Amino acid sequence: MLTRLFSEPGLLSDVPKFASWGDGDDDEPRSDKGDAPPQPPPAPGSGAPGPARAAKPVSLRGGEEIPEPTLAEVKEEGELGGEEEEEEEEEEGLDEAEGERPKKRGPKKRKMTKARLERSKLRRQKANARERNRMHDLNAALDNLRKVVPCYSKTQKLSKIETLRLAKNYIWALSEILRSGKRPDLVSYVQTLCKGLSQPTTNLVAGCLQLNSRNFLTEQGADGAGRFHGSGGPFAMHPYPYPCSRLAGAQCQAAGGLGGGAAHALRTHGYCAAYETLYAAAGGGGASPDYNSSEYEGPLSPPLCLNGNFSLKQDSSPDHEKSYHYSMHYSALPGSRPTGHGLVFGSSAVRGGVHSENLLSYDMHLHHDRGPMYEELNAFFHN
């Protein structure tokens, strides 16, 4: 809309006079409805705006009248001011929202006070102490279990899982003995003990029970090679892929080349009386003997190859350079038998490559020297 300045002298005559402008001028009559009397139209030559520009007067509450252009100007100014205020309020609200918003998503982390830090530290210390005591109790229980199971070694220690497996097999073997009511064969007993165990643990159990671990391997080949046939049966010779450390290469090849169905007519004699004495002295339950001899405290040497049969042997000290067998050593004690028969499996025979045809069985050598004690102990497993 076009606006005009009221300073022009031609427009001052057109401005209506209001009752409130005068100092108590109440000469103008008022209607009951508050409408002012109609004003006469302006003179055409007075320079006033024409009919197109003339606006109807707007009556107010007190009978005041203002022209329409003035009212439109007031409305425009009010709308512009309201929009500016709304924009300012929106900007302030955004600033406040950005200031209150946390930097990271998720629940707001509680502020750690000194009391909360002390409580958290105390809880952590108690949890660590409980876990430490639990592990100490578990290790102590496993150590006690290792003393009970039939496996003993001063240099090696069974792992936790192997200890539990051996204890389970030991309990199963004892329950089978109670169920059958018979004394088991040593080989079947060791087979039950070593079921599911690793090869190092199997060798350790066999060494404690003074047996060759090859005689009770639980997994047999399809052709039956390396199978133990029991008392009175032949050994099926099994070729070994690694060479013998104590014999010459030709002798090991001769011992290993007998596989593939060829078997020696070697009778499986009974176990040595010294082995059975150690086993029976513990009550027949398979408890491990306590070795006090310094001969068995050294590390294990490579397996000893004798006609295809491998057995573990301790590294002997310079005092034990004779390298005679454990059973021959204890069987040669006074009161057992003459020492001449105890050198059948001696070091000279081993180094000389004695074949199985030249070796006499244990029963043939010592039958006339056996006393009642040997007969009774041997009958413990072969009744």
From Swiss-Prot:
Residues 102-114 have a biased composition (Basic residues). It holds the Pfam family HLH. Ubiquitinated by the APC/C complex; leading to its degradation in neurons. The CDC20-APC/C-induced degradation of NEUROD2 drives presynaptic differentiation. Residues 45-57 have a biased composition (Low complexity). One of its GO terms (cellular component) is nucleus. It comes from the Eukaryota. InterPro entries: bHLH_dom, bHLH_transcription_factors, HLH_DNA-bd_sf, NeuroD_DUF, TF_bHLH_NeuroD. SMART domains: HLH. It is found in: Nucleus. Its main location: nucleus. A motif (Nuclear localization signal) lies at residues 108-114. GO terms for biological process: associative learning; behavioral fear response; cellular response to calcium ion; cellular response to electrical stimulus; cerebellar cortex development; negative regulation of synapse maturation; neuron development; positive regulation of calcium-mediated signaling. GO terms for molecular function: DNA binding; DNA-binding transcription activator activity, RNA polymerase II-specific; DNA-binding transcription factor activity; E-box binding; protein heterodimerization activity; RNA polymerase II transcription regulatory region sequence-specific DNA binding. PANTHER family: BASIC HELIX-LOOP-HELIX PROTEIN NEUROGENIN-RELATED (PTHR19290), NEUROGENIC DIFFERENTIATION FACTOR 2 (PTHR19290:SF83). This is Neurogenic differentiation factor 2. It comes from Mus musculus (Mouse). The gene is Neurod2.
